[in-house]
């Protein structure tokens, strides 16, 4: 069986930049979290580059109970980033659907409690696969897990977002126009050097947006490492990390997942050797599996969607790196991302030159 992290990565001491008054958090939980009546031990998960995530362990009359807390990072933040209230809202809205999400306990937008907004959610026992190749897994398990990954993405995109109360969750207009503009702006705000391929993408992408305009809930960061699977079985028990969720285009999610997990261009993974890790689909095989579950008849303009996903992640990576330079990053890995933006942009521009 593959080794995998629980909930959101390895657990350690709270980093100095993210420390807060635990007693004030305890007092808040007694008022806002149903059944809470004990004292808290707080540890920090090492996973995640955006919003700091913590393991809360309550010790009280009912014994030990665990929760997970996510909060905004400290420091001056980009206006459209780290919107944890959106994470909380979308997971709460999806609670009654067939999309697996943790239970939401409380959202606090009062900065006086621990210094920033935060929310408390259910702690789940399961497997989070940090490596898309799933070392130690069998071919059958890899195949089953990636199939379930595609199936649950299709489930998300089938949710009627207006019926679950998310009709105002995204802005009107063309999703890709909106997103390209957003990530250009965020890249400019975090830019530290000139990257020719980023400039090419900034010119190309707005002029080549596909005509097809489906509208669904779009997770925004859907990939294997942001989901949790049953401890022993190949079925998903939670989709995590909803910070980038909006009302958008479903194929942005499909392409992002393929870019991140299956093409090996994110995080320095490199090309996947499927002879050594059988059972992992190619990007086109995953897209076909998604289409089967979604009732969709294929995907046109696939290279645009892939390139957009790489451009978007390039901008995100540059923002994380800039926060690291400024001392505000939520993870120690931030300073390793200095070349990530350039590498992703180069790959995106290369894909757009292809004729397939």
Identify what each model region corresponds to.
Residues 298-299, 315-356:
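Helical subdomain adjoining the active site within ATP-dependent kinase catalytic cores
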Residues 170-171, 297-309:
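All-alpha amphipathic helical-bundle segments outside canonical DNA-binding/catalytic cores
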Residues 252-294, 308-326:
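Active-site activation/catalytic loop segments of kinase-like enzymes and analogous catalytic loops
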Residues 217-219, 224:
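Catalytic-loop of the protein kinase fold
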Residues 2-36:
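Juxta-kinase regulatory segment immediately upstream of eukaryotic protein kinase catalytic domains
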Residues 39-217, 230-233:
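ATP-binding pocket architecture of kinase catalytic cores
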Residues 228-256:
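Catalytic activation segment of kinase domains across protein kinase-like and atypical kinase folds
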Residues 104-107, 225, 300:
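Conserved beta-strand->loop/alpha-helix structural units within folded catalytic cores of enzymes
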């Amino acid at each position: 069986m593959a080794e995998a992290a629980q909930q959101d990565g390895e657990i350690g001491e709270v980093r100095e930049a993210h420390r807060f008054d635990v007693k004030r958090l305890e007092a808040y939980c007694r008022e806002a979290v149903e059944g809470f009546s004990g004292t808290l031990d707080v540890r920090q998960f090492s996973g995640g580059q955006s919003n700091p995530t913590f393991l809360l362990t309550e010790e009280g009359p009912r014994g030990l109970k665990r929760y997970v807390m996510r909060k905004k990072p400290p420091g001056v933040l980009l206006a459209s980033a780290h919107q944890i209230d959106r994470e909380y809202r979308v997971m709460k809205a999806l609670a009654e659907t067939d999309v697996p999400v943790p239970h939401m306990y409380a959202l606090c937008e009062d900065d006086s409690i621990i210094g920033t907004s935060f929310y408390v959610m259910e702690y789940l026992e399961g497997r989070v696969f940090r490596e898309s190749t799933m070392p130690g897994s069998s071919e059958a398990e890899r195949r089953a897990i990636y199939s379930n990954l595609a199936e649950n993405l299709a489930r998300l995109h089938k949710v009627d977002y207006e019926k679950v109360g998310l009709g105002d969750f995204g802005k009107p207009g063309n999703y890709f126009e909106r997103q390209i503009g957003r990530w250009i702006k965020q890249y400019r705000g975090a830019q530290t050097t000139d990257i020719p391929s980023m400039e090419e993408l900034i010119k190309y992408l707005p002029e080549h947006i596909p005509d097809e305009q489906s509208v669904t809930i779009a997770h925004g960061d859907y990939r294997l490492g942001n989901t949790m699977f049953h401890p022993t079985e190949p079925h998903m028990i939670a989709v995590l990390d909803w910070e980038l969720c909006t009302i958008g285009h479903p194929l942005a999610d499909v392409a992002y997942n393929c870019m991140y997990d299956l093409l090996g261009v994110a995080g320095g993974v490199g090309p996947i050797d499927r002879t050594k890790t059988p059972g992992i689909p190619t990007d086109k095989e995953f897209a076909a599996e998604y289409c089967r579950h979604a009732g969709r008849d294929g995907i046109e303009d696939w290279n645009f969607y892939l390139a957009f996903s790489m451009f978007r992640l390039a901008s995100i990576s540059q923002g994380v790196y800039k926060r690291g330079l400024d001392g505000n990053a939520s993870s120690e890995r931030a300073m390793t991302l200095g070349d990530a933006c350039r590498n992703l942009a180069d790959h995106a521009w290369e894909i757009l030159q292809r004729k397939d």
